[in-house]
Amino acid sequence: MKKYIVLALCLMLAITVVMHNRPPQEAATPTPEVPSGEPPVVMPDPPEVNEPLPVVENANELGRVPILMYHRIVAEEGEWARSIENFRNDLKNLYERGYTLVNLSDFYDGKAQVPPGRSPVVLTFDDSTRGQFNYLLDAAGEKYIDPDCAVGILLDAYARWPELGLAGTFFLNGNPFGQSEYWQEKLKHMVDLGFELGSHTFSHPFFNRITDEEIRADIVKLQLQVWQAVPGYHIRALALPYGIAPRDRTVAVSGSHDGVSFNHSYLMEVGAEPAFAPDHVRHNPLSMPRIAATDELLSRWLDWLDGPLRRYISDGNPDVLTYPDELQEQIKKTP
Ligand SMILES: [Zn+2]
């Protein structure tokens, strides 16, 4: 543990040095004209904020991370369907248990901020159905986000509980989210709101029943569709349709078809347990487990995660890896 504290101090020092040496940012607003004869107005520098991070006694950045799997969000709970009411309650429950929403790739790339003492949770949505993101029209014919769709519910929860954060990874198929007149606008809107777009392939095939070339073609078709709405968007993650991987898993990771290449970093399974932390020796980005969001599985796994040394708890500092001594052997060895 000590060497990490030393490392932390070095890093903080290095960051401070870097920040001080950073060239001044381009001014966002033009410099106001100063009438001749009058001395220019000099704005004082803002006071340096150097608040130390709070020490999180139980920080555990080798702990497990729940990646929840949602499908349809609709009025009635059912198979592959979470009710609107239950989805709202899930967000409240996650907030109260100390979780903060993160996008899958942001978190696993080490780019997501999780406040000190809180735990990351990834919400994933498969099949890009209308209940996940729906527009309604007001009396004047203006579009607005349906407050009962997943995106609307996430926005509302974030407004209530800012520490819950606003994130979610949506695994898209062809013709996403119904309302064919708005699909491009919706994808762009989601990216603007900070959500992540993932691939679930264009036509949702069984990967074990088609050729490798057909797999690549289907993946590229979905990617080209996303690019129509959000040019050049890098899709980082693919959720395996039906949870079935190609015989050679790497076929779904990277490749090209018709001169268009794709490059995924993460493959998502269907089921069945909390995922390993990014720095855990057992983290396998090409086979990431997810927990189906049902009453039974959610309460079972969230209760399990509250057990000793189980769940990921952030130290609040993305530059330092903090974990209990007992887990020393579980750290991923970097070559
Ligand atoms: Zn699916």
What residue ranges belong to the model's regions?
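Hydrophobic membrane-insertion alpha-helices, especially the h-region
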Residues: 6-18
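Acidic (Asp/Glu)-rich catalytic clusters
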Residues: 58-60, 114, 154-165, 179-198, ...
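Substrate-binding clefts and substrate-entry loops adjacent to catalytic sites
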Residues: 198-209
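C-terminal active-site subregion of NodB/CE4 polysaccharide deacetylases
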Residues: 30-124, 129-137, 142-145, 209-335
